[in-house]
Every structure is written in C-alpha cells, then in structure tokens.
Amino acid sequence: MEFVEDMRKIRNRKSLYVILFVLVAIFINGLNSNIETTKYDIYDHRVKQEMKVVFIADTHSCKYGEEQEELLQKVKSEKQDLILLGGDIIDDELPMQTGFDTIKDLAKSYPVFYVTGNHEIWSGKQEYIKRKIKSLGIEVLEGNIKEINVKGNLVNILGLEILR
C-alpha cells in the first residue's frame, strides 16, 4: 500500500511540473514583443518616383528597448517617406503612455497617419487616445481620405474606423 501511495505522490508531482512548465511557456510567449518586418515591392505605372512606406501595427503598448529605442531605430533605418499606423498601438490593458512613447518621435521627422484599432476601442478611451495622438502631430484618419504628395506622387490614404 505504501508503494501505491508513493507512486501517486510522484505522479502528482510530475503533473504539477508539467502544469508549471506549460504556464511558464505561455507567460514567456505572451512577453514576446519582437519586431517583425516584412518587405513588399509594389510596382505601378502611376508611381513617378520610388517611395518607401512603413506600416506599423499591433505594438500593444509594449516596450521596445529603453525609451522605445529598438523600434525607433528599426523604423529610422528604413529611410521611409511615410508612416502608417494601423491600430492597436495603444493596448486596452497595458499602460497607454508606453504606446504614446512608441509614436511620439515619429511625427517629428515623417508624415504619419493613424487609424484606431480594436484595442483602442476596447479601452473605452478611444476619443481621448485620438486627441492625444493628434496632439503628437499625427494625422488621425476617421473614415476620411487624405490626399498627399510623396516625392511627386499623389497618394490617397483612406482610414476606416472599426465600429463597435
């Protein structure tokens, strides 16, 4: 009988270790905030001069190095002409200021356009977020089209808002 009891303790301990391992793996995966880049070359006969656009989305108020330096250096290294922010820059659970820190320096050097993502809406502070982003010098597109000139190319940018 003692042998059976010892085997149960070992099995319970193994189960505990497996559960603990799975929880740690899930936690570590949740902390993954690596920067992924994908490059596309798009050709169109209407484009007079080559231009480079950087699209940033789903940063979710994560930290990318001290004062967001890792992300900012990555963006600046692209030598882009235009930056589009595709939503979920601000998270509905993490501190908003980290998200604002991610984008505040971008508008100083480049034309930047922003659309709201679902996490900004889920925060319940969508209007505050849009006002704050506008105050950083970033154009917020709210279902409107903006025509801009990029290196002699007329570009129309449409920002669609997600409805609740």
PLM segments and residue spans:
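N-terminal membrane-anchoring alpha-helices
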Residues: 1-47
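A generic structural signal for ordered alpha-helices
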Residues: 18-20, 53, 111, 153
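Beta-strand-turn-beta hairpins that frame and shape the catalytic cleft
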Residues: 35, 41-54, 138-139, 145-159
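Membrane-embedded segments
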Residues: 50-141
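Active-site-proximal loop/helix segment associated with metal-binding centers of metalloenzymes
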Residues: 161-164
